[in-house]
From Swiss-Prot:
It is found in: Secreted. Residues 1-18 form the signal peptide. Keywords: Amidation, Disulfide bond, Ion channel impairing toxin, Neurotoxin, Secreted, Signal, Toxin, Voltage-gated sodium channel impairing toxin. It comes from Lychas mucronatus. Binds voltage-independently at site-4 of sodium channels (Nav) and shift the voltage of activation toward more negative potentials thereby affecting sodium channel activation and promoting spontaneous and repetitive firing. This is Neurotoxin LmNaTx64.1.
Length: 87
């Protein structure tokens, strides 16, 4: 019973320290912009897994990769802190 409680407690804390969002490009001309895609879930899934996310997919309406269960330290795009200057 104690082991089951410990597993559930651990799963809870892991879930608390994860987030979902659009990963951003960290260097170059497009720094601060979302990672773009055009209906290519495999590309986005690979990008998200490299960032230690659980899965990723191409969000068609935004033409950008969306990642689920990213660690908190991975920067994600936010409208409030948008620094993308790509044209």
């Amino acid at each position: 019973m104690k082991i089951l409680f410990l597993i559930i407690l651990t799963a809870f804390f892991i879930g608390v320290h994860c987030k979902h969002g659009y990963p951003i490009i960290r260097a170059g001309r497009d720094k601060g912009c979302k990672v773009s895609c055009v209906i290519n879930n495999q590309y986005c899934d690979t990008e998200c897994k490299q960032l230690k996310g659980r899965r990723g997919y191409c969000y068609f309406w935004r033409l950008a990769c969306f990642c689920e269960y990213l660690p908190d330290y991975v920067p994600t795009w936010s409208r409030a802190t948008n620094k993308c200057k790509a044209k």
